[in-house]
Amino acid sequence: MFIFGAIALLVDMQAHAQEEVIDTAQFLAVYDYQCKTQNNEGETVVDAMEVVVQVGRTMTKSMPWSQSSLREPTFEAEGKFYQETYLHMPTVWIGWPEGQTTSRELIFPNEFEGKEPTPELQWTLTDDTLRVGDYLCQKATTTYRGLTWQAYYTEEIPSSAGPWRLRGLPGLIVKAESGAHSFVLTQVLQQSEPITYKPNPEARQLSYKKLLKYRTDIYGNKQYVKNPVYYLPEFNELMKTIPNAQVTVLKQFDALFVNWMPVLHKGHVYQPLEKE
């Protein structure tokens, strides 16, 4: 609880000091994201986290639950926060800047940001229907960067938004699946709140193509599962700063926290959302 409280305080302090309001959310869509993979012993596991999407007038912002206004400083929340570390889910602004998609993520020990023109997903609409929760949905399919997706959308919520980078259908995406990955809508919250972008001068700026390659090279390496920081010098001291990264590493009990963000001792096999 101490760690999560410190994280929340740090995030709030940074946000109030630097963030820019770039749109206003009309509602929030909360998704359960699950990924089937293997742990460092080769056992099948299902990692899960919540993804929160702010749906604005001109843009959307998809983010891990811990980066959203829904986070809470509770013991249960601390476990959810740690679970996010296995899944490498970035924060994605679609439509910021105008016509662009911006992706930001921590690849220890640095934060990275990549931009690209917003890609248009080429969906094939079908007559198939499925009831997902309270919504009657229609099926659509697309292939996006090496993965084929089956998505179900509802025209009951007239928005082209969806989780992560999935978008562009005649209604809100309620469910989307591709191989190891699945997103399922769990809540629609009718609340208005600012959509923000916080400039980070320390973030490493790359083209999105280069960021995607770097992410795949790091997490896709076979060494990652046994030692998630295989590509960095060993560190065992209680606290130290890694050269040129401008981050602080804290060791508490059997966990490591970098700028209050958890770092894994053992990883899970990387299942990329984008392969090309």
What are these regions, as identified by a protein language model?
Residues M1-D12:
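Bacterial N-terminal signal peptides
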Residues A15-Q122, T126-T129, L136, R145, ...:
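Extracellular or lumenal secretory-pathway regions
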Residues A17-Q26, S159-P170:
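Short, surface-exposed loop and linker segments with low hydrophobicity and enrichment for Pro/Ser/Thr
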Residues A25-V30, G133-A140, G168-K175:
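Short, hydrophobic/aromatic-rich segments at coil-to-beta transitions
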Residues T142-T143, T154:
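Residue-level structural signal for beta-strand termini and adjacent loop
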Residues R145, L166-P170, G179:
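Alpha-helix initiation and capping sites
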Residues T148-R167, T186-Q187:
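Short helix-loop boundary/capping segments
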Residues Y152, K175-A176:
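Short, conserved beta-strand edge motifs with alternating hydrophobic and charged residues
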